[in-house]
Amino acid sequence: MPRDNMASLIQRIARQACLTFRGSSTGSEGPAPGFPENLSLLKSLLTQVRAEDLNIAPRKALPQPLPRNLPPVTYMHIYETEGFSLGVFLLKSGTCIPLHDHPGMHGMLKVLYGTVRISCMDKLDTGAGHRRPPPEQQFEPPLQPLEREAVRPGVLRSRAEYTEASGPCVLTPHRDNLHQIDAVDGPAAFLDILAPPYDPEDGRDCHYYRVVEPIRPKEASGSACDLPREVWLLETPQADDFWCEGEPYPGPKVLP
């Protein structure tokens, strides 16, 4: 059963998100006044939320492989304004949300049940042009000529596992803006805030990427596991085996 104060908590989360991200959809330069303090308050509220508070029961693992007609990920819409969206993503066992970006957006992710592994990356700003791999650099698997022209430098900043006991994972327009989310050892779900929401007509479309690994000389110092480390990113279409469908949200309603 939800705690007695949870209806007010999810309402307070939405209200605090409104304060934190006010003006984020208007194209105004920089965050609103008091943004760091408001963001800290929002993180504190998100840290408290649990699956039972939203009337969401942890899902059981389904037999593998998943039937092809079942979406690997579903989404429960809770609330949305021009400034932010609030909802829950549910990942089936063994699935992931592929590496993708959030152009000009902030994001906050709080695990409700299960464990997710989040890999956070950024594209490296190279000014007016872009840096290409040197001609002698080889990749595994090899890149086609057009792919070689299209790859961009990036940085893999972190890779960590989050559970319901973890605080929220936060991304900004300039830090950890690309991420991949994998369900680890079973199904998982997380509460998600995006500010402002995706809007292709306003330049906030979702782009997918894959990491292409250079072949490293055996004598090269350091390990591929050392983070942060430079990577190469190739924009790709949405994977055929990934899609997301909606399902009803069973928890307390959020009012304007």
From Swiss-Prot:
One of its GO terms (cellular component) is mitochondrion. Fe cation binds at residues 100, 102, 179. GO terms for molecular function: cysteamine dioxygenase activity; iron ion binding. Keywords: Dioxygenase, Iron, Metal-binding, Oxidoreductase. One of its GO terms (biological process) is cellular response to hypoxia. Changing residue 102 to A: Loss of enzyme activity and iron incorporation. It catalyses: cysteamine + O2 = hypotaurine + H(+); N-terminal L-cysteinyl-[protein] + O2 = N-terminal S-hydroxy-S-oxy-L-cysteinyl-[protein] + H(+). It comes from the Eukaryota. Its cofactor is Fe cation. Its EC number is 1.13.11.19. Ubiquitous, with highest expression in brain, heart and skeletal muscle (at protein level). Plays a vital role in regulating thiol metabolism and preserving oxygen homeostasis by oxidizing the sulfur of cysteamine and N-terminal cysteine-containing proteins to their corresponding sulfinic acids using O2 as a cosubstrate. Catalyzes the oxidation of cysteamine (2-aminoethanethiol) to hypotaurine. Catalyzes the oxidation of the regulator of G-protein signaling 5 (RGS5). Also oxidizes proteins RGS4 and interleukin-32 (IL32). Monomer. This is 2-aminoethanethiol dioxygenase. It comes from Mus musculus (Mouse). The gene is Ado.
